[in-house]
Regions:
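Hydrophobic faces of well-ordered beta-strands that scaffold small-molecule active sites
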Residues: 3-9, 25-29, 54-57, 89-91, ...
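Active-site mouth loops of central-metabolism enzymes
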Residues: 3-12, 61-68, 108-114
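N-terminal ordered "arm"
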Residues: 6-36
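Active-site beta-loop-alpha junctions enriched in small/polar residues
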Residues: 10-12, 30-34, 59-62, 93-94, ...
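Acidic-and-aromatic substrate-binding clefts and catalytic sites of carbohydrate-active enzymes
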Residues: 14-15, 31-43, 62-72
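Acidic (Asp/Glu)-rich catalytic clusters
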Residues: 16-22, 39-56, 72-87, 124-129
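Structured, acidic catalytic/metal-binding patches in enzyme active sites
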Residues: 51, 58-69, 84, 93
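Active-site acidic/histidine proton-transfer and metal-coordination neighborhood
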Residues: 70-139
Length: 139
C-alpha cells in the first residue's frame, strides 16, 4: 500500500483506527508513548500496524541539545523501528535536555555555526544508531 493520507494516532482514536479501511491511510505516533516492554498501547499499535503503515515522529531526543542523544532513548527508538518498520522516522529539531534535566517542551536553539555542527553530529548519531535516514522538523 502506498501511504497517501496520515493521521496522528491518539489513544482516544484506537477503536476508529482499528476499524479504518481507507486505502493509503497511515498513522503517525510519538515513539516516546510506546517505549515500554509491553502493555495495551503496544498491543493496539501492533494490531494497527498489521493494517496500516506507521510513521514514528519523535519529540524527546533533543537533537539540538549541547550533549549527545541519550543512548537509552536511541536504543528504545531502535527497538520500535525494528518492531514496527515505519516508512518514515522523524524527530523535532529542538532541545529539551540540559545537564541531565529534561524540559517538557521543544525549545528553540541558537542559529550559530557551532549549533549547526552539534546538530549535524547528533543527527548523524541518530541515523547511525537506527541504521537509516531520518527526517527532522523544526519546531
Amino acid at each position: 500500500m502506498t501511504p497517501a493520507a496520515g493521521l496522528g494516532l491518539k489513544p482516544q482514536h484506537y477503536d476508529e483506527a482499528l476499524a479504518a479501511t481507507a486505502p493509503g491511510l497511515w498513522f503517525e505516533v510519538h515513539p516516546e508513548n510506546y517505549m515500554s516492554a509491553g502493555g495495551p498501547r503496544l498491543t493496539v499499535l501492533t494490531a494497527i500496524r498489521t493494517r496500516h503503515p506507521l510513521s514514528l515522529h519523535g519529540v524527546g531526543l533533543s537533537l539540538a541539545a549541547d550533549a549527545d542523544p541519550d543512548p537509552e532513548h536511541l536504543q528504545a527508538l531502535k527497538t520500535l523501528v525494528d518492531r514496527f518498520e515505519p516508512f518514515v522516522v522523524s524527530e523535532h529539531l529542538a532541545w529539551s535536555t540540559h545537564r541531565g534535566l529534561h524540559q517538557p517542551d521543544l525549545l528553540p536553539f541558537p542559529r550559530t555555526h557551532a549549533a549547526l555542527s552539534r546538530i549535524a553530529g547528533n543527527i548523524g548519531r541518530m541515523q547511525d544508531a537506527l541504521g537509516r535516514q531520518v527526517l527532522v522538523e523544526n519546531p
